[in-house]
Every structure is written in C-alpha cells, then in structure tokens.
Swiss-Prot record:
GO terms for biological process: abaxial cell fate specification; anther development; carpel development; flower development; leaf morphogenesis; regulation of flower development; specification of floral organ identity; stamen development. This is Zinc finger protein JAGGED. Residues 1-46 are annotated as: Disordered. InterPro entries: JAGGED/SL1-like, Znf_C2H2_sf, Znf_C2H2_type. It comes from Arabidopsis thaliana (Mouse-ear cress).
C-alpha cells in the first residue's frame, strides 16, 4: 500500500507506464488540436463578413482592400472637381478682353470679337469665315489757303513762268511746274496772249524757246480785288507784255 500511494517513487514504476504516458500525451494533443480547429472555424465564420463599397457597390472580404478602393474613388472625385473649376475659369477668362487676362492663358476663342475697326485686314483661322477689315477713309484735302488783298501766296516766285496750251477758256498761273495751280483768271479779248493757254513759268517766243531779255523783278501777283477783275487783268497783262529771261544770270557767268 505504501509503494502504491507514493507516485514519485521511480523504482516502483509499472511496465506499461511509457505506453500509458504516450497515450495520455496523444489524447491531450488531440484534444488541444480539436480545440484549435474549432477556434479557427469560429474565426473563419467571424472573418466571413462582406464589405461593400458605397460608390460602386463592390464587395470585399477584407476591410483593407475596401479602404484602398475607397481612396481611389476619392482621388477620382477630387480630379473631377478640379476639372470643373478649370472649366469655369476658362469660361470667365473668355468673357474678359484679351489685354486684361488675369492668369495669362492663351485665348482659344475667336479673336475677331475684340478686333479694332481700323486694324489691318487679317485672316483668322478660328473664325467661321474670313473677314476682311475695311481700311479707314482718307482724310479730305485741306481747303485752299484764303488770301486777302494785302497777303500774297507763299508759293509765288519771280521769273518762273512759261506758256502751255493745256486749258482753254481760262488761264491758270502756277509758280513752278511741280506746284499746283493757285490762281485762275479769265482773260478778256484785249489780252496779248491768245485764249486757251496756261501761263506757267517763263514766256516762250515764236521760235518755241524762252525769250531772252533783261531780267526784271516785279511784285507778286495779287488776287482779283473787284467783281470784274480789272486790277488783276491789268497786272497780268503788264507782266505778259515784258519778256522775262531767267537764263541771263547763267550766260553772264
């Protein structure tokens, strides 16, 4: 009885103790393995939850996969809002004139909306049809310089007159061939020159060349002072009776 009650006595071990110990260890290991399997099955049942996306209704087994998918949706929505804001900015920019661009964007709209009326004709590729801008009208010529009875024309020259059969019925006096006619006087029948000639430059003789004679300096011609033009006709007749030689100074040299 003493030996049976003392389990710590190694000398009185039974013969089948190793077998019994192995059986007991196997039983304990199998029980623990069954418990682990049961725990894993319960964990699988717990992890079998399905996570659904709020945007596209996709289902995920793990919350991490759903989080990455939701981040992509957020990025897409952010880029969409940015694109909408850019479109609004472009629309507001097209309303303002091209010279007052606040953001420095290049205008892609039709530039003919803000073109000037006096600009040069241009062809714009963005417009529906090629529009040619008309040139501004030329300013009218200045009116003739009004000469009074005591004032003389600044274009009057001396000894620079010649005859030219260009105008008939009237005679026009011009200081030089390069300047326009400044005074036109209708001569009567008592004029020494036949009607239908223009008096411009030095007088021409019967040979067709300028008449050579003493150079006489006279006062410039004045416009008509009366209704009938007597004073102007007398001065012009007096100047035409005396020949003028504008080449005397050259021959004297």
């Amino acid at each position: 009885m003493r030996h049976e009650e003392n389990y710590l006595d190694l000398n009185n071990l039974p013969d089948d103790f190793s077998k019994d110990g192995n059986k007991q260890a196997l039983e304990e290991g199998s029980s623990s393995g069954q418990r682990k399997k049961k725990g894993s099955k319960e964990g699988k049942d717990e992890s079998g939850k399905v996570y659904e996306c709020r945007f596209c209704s996709l289902k995920f087994c793990k919350s991490q996969a759903l989080g990455g998918h939701m981040n992509r949706h957020r990025q897409e929505r952010e880029t969409e809002t940015l694109n909408q804001a850019r479109q609004l900015v472009y629309r507001n920019d097209t309303i303002t004139p091209p010279g007052i661009s606040p953001f420095g964007y290049h205008h892609t709209t039709d530039p003919t909306i803000y073109r000037s009326v006096y600009s040069s004709p241009m062809i714009y590729p963005g417009s529906s049809s090629t529009n040619l801008v008309p040139q501004p009208p030329m300013p009218p010529p200045p009116p003739p310089y009004p000469y009074s009875s005591n004032q003389y024309s600044p274009h009057n020259h001396f000894n620079d007159y010649y005859l030219n059969p260009s105008f008939r019925g009237s005679r026009s006096i011009s200081p030089s061939p390069n300047l326009p006619t400044t005074t036109t006087v209708d001569y009567m029948a008592d004029s020494p020159v036949e009607p239908g000639y223009t008096c411009v430059g030095a007088p021409i003789g019967p040979t067709g060349f300028p008449i050579r004679g003493p150079s006489i300096v006279r006062a410039p011609l004045e416009p008509p002072q009366g209704r009938d033009g007597d004073a102007s006709r007398q001065r012009l007749d007096h100047s035409l009776r005396f020949p003028i030689n504008r080449f005397q100074d050259h021959h004297s040299l």
